[in-house]
């Protein structure tokens, strides 16, 4: 699974996931399913914000190619992917500027158009079950929840899906692609089932053979949303754009 993650996700997403796990004392080489889940969640958050801007009239607009007009403002502030100190600094700044209620838990995004924090969920289970778990944890009507599954299902607070259908379809297609790629390599069952994951881990620890059948190339294209995480360690030039193929795994 670790090899799959490193070769099928953008290197910057992988690095952010590694930093997040190490911040909590977790090892990506051991907790490989969690490593994959974090990378998937990060990519979903970045794709959620990609191409979406607010014009000078305060209207939402989509710009998919080239540099956006200087008058346009990014619609979403990305909180997920930052270290906790920086993330809370961003949240506090937003709350002080907009007057919105400070959330109890760190959200994933802030929507400047709807003036609300957003919690993104990606689940391997039923969307309604995961939605209820998120809602019970957050316990705040101020934070908007949007759940995606690997089967193309989604669920959002008050059935308000925030994004246009095409933007959401990009995310759903990417998640379905990840599922297919995992399944083709015999990784999906262990990703879904903790019991199977433990069995696979024991098997992997016993084997010293290198993984075979994995893709040999990795996409180095950068999601525009990743660029907004500067000045952490990325440059501020938002030029690369995820297209319809957005970071598909390369097959041999």
From Swiss-Prot:
Superkingdom, natural source: Viruses
Site (Important for efficient shutoff activity): 202-203, 206
Record key words, sorted: Decay of host mRNAs by virus, Eukaryotic host gene expression shutoff by virus, Host cytoplasm, Host gene expression shutoff by virus, Host mRNA suppression by virus, Host nucleus, Host-virus interaction
Active site positions, chain numbering: 80, 108
GO molecular function: RNA binding
Location of this chain's protein in the cell: Host cytoplasm; Host nucleus
Predominant localisation class: host cell
Residues annotated as site: Important for efficient shutoff activity and nuclear localization: 195, 198-199
Family annotation (InterPro entries): PA/PA-X, PA/PA-X_sf
Biological processes annotated in GO: viral RNA genome replication; viral translational frameshifting
Domain notes: The probable endonuclease active site in the N-terminus and the basic amino acid cluster in the C-terminus are important for the shutoff activity. The C-terminus acts as a nuclear localization signal. The C-terminus is recruited to host protein complexes involved in nuclear Pol II RNA processing.
Function: Plays a major role in the shutoff of the host protein expression by cleaving mRNAs probably via an endonuclease activity. This host shutoff allows the virus to escape from the host antiviral response. Hijacks host RNA splicing machinery to selectively target host RNAs containing introns for destruction. This may explain the preferential degradation of RNAs that have undergone co- or post-transcriptional processing.
Recorded family membership: Belongs to the influenza viruses PA-X family.
Protein name, entry field: Protein PA-X
Organism field: Influenza A virus (strain A/Turkey/Ireland/1378/1983 H5N8)
């Amino acid at each position: 699974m670790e090899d799959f993650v490193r070769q099928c996700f953008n290197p910057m997403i992988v690095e952010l996931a590694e930093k997040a796990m190490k911040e909590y004392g977790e090892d990506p080489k051991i907790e490989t399913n969690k490593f994959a889940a974090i990378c998937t969640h990060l990519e979903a958050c970045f794709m959620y914000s990609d191409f979406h801007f607010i014009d000078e009239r305060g209207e939402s607009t989509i710009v998919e190619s080239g540099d956006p007009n200087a008058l346009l403002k990014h619609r979403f502030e990305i909180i997920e992917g930052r270290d906790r100190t920086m993330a809370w600094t961003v949240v506090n700044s937003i709350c002080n500027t907009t007057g919105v209620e400070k959330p109890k838990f760190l959200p994933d995004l802030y929507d400047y158009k709807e003036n609300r924090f957003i919690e993104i969920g990606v689940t391997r289970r039923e969307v309604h079950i995961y939605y209820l778990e998120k809602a019970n944890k957050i316990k705040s009507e101020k934070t908007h929840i949007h759940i995606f599954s690997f089967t193309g299902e989604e669920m959002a607070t008050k059935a308000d899906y925030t994004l246009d259908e095409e933007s959401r379809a990009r995310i759903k297609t990417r998640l379905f692609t990840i599922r297919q790629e995992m399944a083709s390599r015999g990784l999906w069952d262990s990703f879904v089932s903790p019991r199977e994951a433990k069995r696979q881990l024991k098997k992997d620890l016993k084997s010293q053979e290198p993984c075979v059948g994995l893709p040999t190339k990795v996409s180095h294209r950068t999601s525009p949303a990743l660029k907004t995480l500067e000045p952490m360690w990325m440059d501020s030039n938002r030029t690369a754009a995820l297209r319809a193929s957005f970071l598909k795994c390369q097959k041999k």
